[in-house]
């Protein structure tokens, strides 16, 4: 059987909020090393990859590997019934067609027990090649979310230009254009407020803001976000989940001749 207990249950609630608007259903791969999810979004434009390591859970047991087909909207609805302070336990028998979710209030006086039907999903795993990136920008996640939101009022796409001294986000549309430049910060007291850039060569790429705004729903998971870019390969937007793993989004750049469309 599979059983995982998470004292900080709010992490799971935040993960589902970050996934459910982009993906309708996905296969949760459960193994002794942890929980993994990989899925294209419903329009096959972006890819999501989630890792929650077993040691990040307070207790974790997995007797044999499971592939659980989950409707993320349904799971999100059930998790909304959990309080932010609740301890969440996930439980499934080896060949079960349901996943049990148990929410315990911290004072132990209230226990909620839900059972969610699982789905049969035929999922192909895509190999994501490890690679070096020309530009890696680490910045406050709230700042990235604000930039994507602000520029989506101007246009549908953002041009991200990365140089040694800073990173620039630009958008243009019928009402005009907007540019936001963040300089690399050298002496910030708090690491999560810093803008750090590792650059091998300058990069300028265009991305659909609609998808970036979906990705920024993961902002509550991490105070920082990392953007990894190289010419002609998908952008990686990574949110670290403290002591547990990460949530990565992949988005291919828009090709030059598409930009007018």
From Swiss-Prot:
Keyword Ribonucleoprotein assigned: no
Cystine pairs: 135-162
Domain of life: Eukaryota
Compartments reported by the entry: Nucleus
UniProt signal peptide: none
An example Gene Ontology molecular-function term: histone acetyltransferase binding
Family designation: Belongs to the PCNA family.
Protein name per its UniProtKB record: Proliferating cell nuclear antigen
Gene name, Swiss-Prot/TrEMBL: PCNA
